[in-house]
């Protein structure tokens, strides 16, 4: 238990007084607002409207809910690309319906107007605001394509197809009204509409909703999947869909529990858990794996990593229990031998031997760029097993080791090794045990007296960028003290 005797109710140093500056609307803004208030006039003006005004007027109409104008703008959009950006967070059901009705009008056109160039509509948050691409086809997936009819076929027409891309579908237990409407709309037009979702979040699980999603969404285009607050047997239910995700790049398993969700509260036995995990399909393209609060990963980490086809770039494990066998398998897993980012945090490691982790660092020494070993209760002798390999990780850019139990002499030894890593631009080290009294009270004056010498160890070998020393979080307020080379003093930070 760590206690801070100076727990401020708020950190006054972080308060900033800001003044709101009022900017009067420009003549253009006033003209646009006046135009939008007359829907009939606004719609009739679209054919002669300068292209440069389309994004501005669309954003105003979207924000203020002029759904009739939105509907009319889609079929005459003069750019190949339309991204809603952050505005998608404010998209209600009526606005969504208006935009989809505009797409229906576009699909129904037998002759494409010379003005409309729309090929991609993007319900993603890539951009801060509504944006219209000006480079036709450059780096963009086709949104509107035309399949040419068979030559000399009687009564044949050009078949139009649309691709609609959305950033994320969030399924929290049951589908919300807007998502349900979008899926049904796309399903009813499945011959001409292809709905692509780059990111899928499933929080809780209604099997009927999952089945409904994959009737419409192209699973092979999902690049990021987040599974949160589901049971392990429900994870097994998703296996057939995981097999279809040929482009899955990032997988997050967050709070996957080992009990049945439908009335049976008994914990699964180890044999059943192993059987369910072993059924996970091969993930051919996965590059990033995040595992948080998954209790049954203990003793089964090797089975999880077995599913990987390509070498991982990022492995992040937090709030889990690991066994010695889990650590022992790491150096011998070929699919993590090219890691660029290794993050292990909030895992109790003080009872384990870390030599296997040192062997892993040796294997990834030529590729590793970030290393996080935070809040793992690692003590001096365990850290010592990592030092020889750590100093050979010459491409490291970031290291964080805060909230571990190291002494001042060992911390100096650690710094002598990281001082050899010339590419480091961000470093966060734990405050040594000597910065706490026997009751766990943080002694900031000691940290302030130790840190100049600690910084000198690094400064003697290389140029410093961002270097800090951080205490363990206070058990009362959750804050901590940080000493960094820029302020050269301890400052209180309230951690979220």
From Swiss-Prot:
It comes from Mus musculus (Mouse). May down-regulate the expression of spermatogenesis-associated genes in female germ cells allowing their normal differentiation into oocytes. May act as a Ras-mediated signaling protein in early embryogenesis. GO terms for cellular component: cytoplasm; nucleus. It is found in: Nucleus; Cytoplasm. This is Oogenesin-1. It comes from the Eukaryota. Its main location: nucleus. GO terms for biological process: negative regulation of apoptotic process; negative regulation of cell differentiation; negative regulation of DNA-templated transcription; oocyte development; positive regulation of cell population proliferation. InterPro entries: LRR_dom_sf, PRAME, PRAME_domain.
């Amino acid at each position: 238990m760590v206690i801070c005797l100076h727990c401020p109710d708020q950190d006054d140093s972080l308060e900033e007084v800001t003044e709101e500056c009022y900017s009067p609307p420009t003549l253009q803004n006033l003209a646009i607002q006046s135009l939008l208030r007359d829907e009939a006039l606004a719609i009739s003006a679209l054919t002669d409207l300068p292209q440069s005004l389309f994004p501005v007027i669309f954003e105003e109409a979207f924000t203020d809910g002029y759904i009739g104008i939105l509907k009319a703008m889609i079929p005459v959009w003069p750019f190949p690309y339309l991204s809603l950006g952050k505005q998608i967070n404010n998209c209600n059901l009526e606005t969504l319906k208006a935009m989809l009705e505009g797409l229906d009008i576009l699909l129904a056109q037998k002759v494409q107007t010379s003005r409309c160039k729309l090929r991609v509509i993007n319900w993603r948050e890539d951009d801060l605001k509504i944006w219209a691409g000006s480079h036709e086809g450059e780096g963009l997936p086709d949104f509107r394509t035309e399949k040419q009819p068979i030559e000399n076929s009687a009564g044949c027409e050009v078949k139009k197809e649309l691709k609609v891309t959305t950033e994320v579908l969030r399924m929290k237990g049951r589908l919300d009204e807007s998502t349900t409407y979008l899926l049904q709309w796309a399903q009813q037009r499945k011959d001409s509409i292809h709905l692509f979702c780059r990111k899928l979040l499933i929080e809780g699980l209604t099997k009927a909703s999952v089945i409904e999603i994959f009737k419409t969404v192209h699973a092979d285009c999902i690049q990021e999947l987040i599974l949160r607050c589901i049971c392990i047997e429900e994870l097994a239910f998703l296996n057939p869909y995981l097999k279809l995700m040929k482009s899955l790049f990032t997988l997050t398993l967050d709070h996957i529990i080992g009990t049945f969700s439908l009335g049976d509260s008994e914990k699964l036995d180890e044999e059943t858990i192993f059987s369910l995990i072993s059924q996970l399909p091969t993930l051919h393209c996965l590059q990033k794996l995040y595992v948080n609060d998954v209790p049954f990963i203990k003793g089964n980490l090797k089975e999880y990593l077995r599913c990987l086809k390509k070498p991982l770039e990022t492995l992040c494990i937090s709030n889990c229990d690991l066994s010695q066998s889990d650590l022992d398998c790491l150096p011998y897993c070929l699919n993590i031998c090219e890691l660029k980012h290794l993050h292990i945090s909030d895992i109790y490691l003080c009872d384990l031997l870390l030599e296997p982790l040192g062997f892993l660092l040796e294997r990834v020494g030529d590729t590793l760029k970030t290393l996080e070993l935070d809040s793992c209760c690692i003590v001096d002798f365990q850290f010592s097993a990592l030092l020889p390999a750590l100093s050979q990780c010459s491409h490291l850019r970031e290291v964080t080791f805060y909230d571990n139990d190291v002494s001042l002499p060992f911390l100096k030894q650690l710094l002598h090794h990281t001082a050899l890593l010339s590419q480091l631009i961000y470093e966060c080290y734990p405050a040594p045990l000597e910065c706490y009294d026997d009751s766990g009270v943080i002694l900031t004056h000691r940290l302030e007296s130790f840190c100049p010498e600690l910084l000198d160890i690094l400064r003697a070998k290389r140029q410093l960028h961002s270097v800090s020393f951080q205490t363990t979080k206070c058990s009362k307020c959750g804050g901590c003290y940080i000493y960094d080379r820029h302020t050269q003093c301890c400052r209180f930070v309230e951690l979220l």
